[in-house]
Amino acid sequence: MQKKKVLVFLAKAFEIMEFSVFIDVLGWARNDYGHNLFVDTCGFTDIVVSTFNVPVIVDKTIGEINVDEYDALAIPGGFGEFGFYEEAYDERFLKLIKEFNAKGKIIASICSAALPLGKSGVLKNRKATTYHLKNGYWQEKLKEFGVNVVNEPIVVDGNIITSYCPETASNVAFELLKNTDFRRRNGSNKKSYGILRKMLTKLLEVKL
């Protein structure tokens, strides 16, 4: 079975809840259901601090990343008032996004993480969504990047997954798993995916 790798990028002031679902869903899939999926975390610095001051030691810094080693990019959103866009809009990260997209790799974003995708240009003339509260302020910002904004919880356009609030986090992680494990379509895989989704849905107490 071919090994698959997902890169989870953490910008300053990322949301812990949106980060943790990628680790949990892909970790359970690997540990209990035999999916050959592995995760590397990445940031601009060795330690990235979340919105509410939880420090995370990442596996790699952005300068160490070789896009060819990965099958997907996962991006948790974060709070602008805590400095999320200072790093999320950094040209080095925007370049990384463009490299993943140019190679047709899956890119999964949660909530406000769609904004750096928009700024990078990979969503121009494509369908996407982002944080929908605050009277749709951030969705209007996304439109400024030439994005066809859809006011739906999750929007998939080709290789890119976007969502509109933290409540969708687990759904996005499962969508990433479905699209990244990646086109293993045998019956065993479908069964294990269904069991895992049902189990984690109950644990997370979310509606999927």
What kind of feature is each model-predicted range?
Residues 156:
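Active-site anion-handling motifs in enzyme catalytic cores
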Residues 1-103, 115-122, 141-151, 159-208:
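Extended, subdomain-level signal for the structured scaffold at the beginning of enzyme domains
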Residues 132-136:
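Short, acidic/turn-prone active-site loops that include or flank metal/cofactor-
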Residues 110-111:
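Short, thiol/selenol-centered motifs that function as redox-active sites or metal-ligating centers
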Residues 129-130, 162:
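Ser/Thr-centric signal marking residues that sit
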